[in-house]
């Protein structure tokens, strides 16, 4: 019984370690460019991908985050890479 429990712990530890080591490392960049509100009627990611700044900067994703002040809707922030890579 004791060896079965030890074997289970060892196998679980190996599985956890392998999943951490084999998981892809992602660099998301910076998501701090505000672009209005996230609502059920508007997709934040699609809005950010379509939007281009005056400087010509493009975005690859959009994230909804809580606002600084209480609100019904969350805020949409666009994600971008800087010229060096991910910020």
Curated annotation (Swiss-Prot):
The keyword Metal-binding does not apply. It is found in: Secreted. It comes from the Eukaryota. Its main location: secreted. Disulfide bonds join 31-79, 38-64, 44-76, 48-78. One of its GO terms (cellular component) is extracellular region. Keywords: Antimicrobial, Disulfide bond, Fungicide, Plant defense, Secreted, Signal. The keyword Signal applies. One of its GO terms (biological process) is defense response to fungus. Residues 1-29 form the signal peptide. Belongs to the DEFL family. This is Defensin-like protein 100. It comes from Arabidopsis thaliana. The lineage of its organism: Eukaryota, Viridiplantae, Streptophyta, Embryophyta, Tracheophyta.
């Amino acid at each position: 019984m004791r060896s079965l429990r030890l074997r289970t712990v060892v196998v679980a530890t190996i599985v956890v370690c392998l999943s951490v080591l084999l998981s892809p490392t992602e660099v998301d960049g910076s998501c701090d460019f505000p672009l209005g509100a996230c609502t059920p009627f508007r997709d934040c990611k699609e809005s950010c991908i379509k939007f281009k700044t005056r400087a010509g900067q493009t975005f690859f994703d959009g994230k909804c985050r809580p606002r600084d002040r209480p609100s019904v809707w969350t805020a949409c922030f666009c994600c971008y890479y800087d010229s060096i890579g991910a910020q």
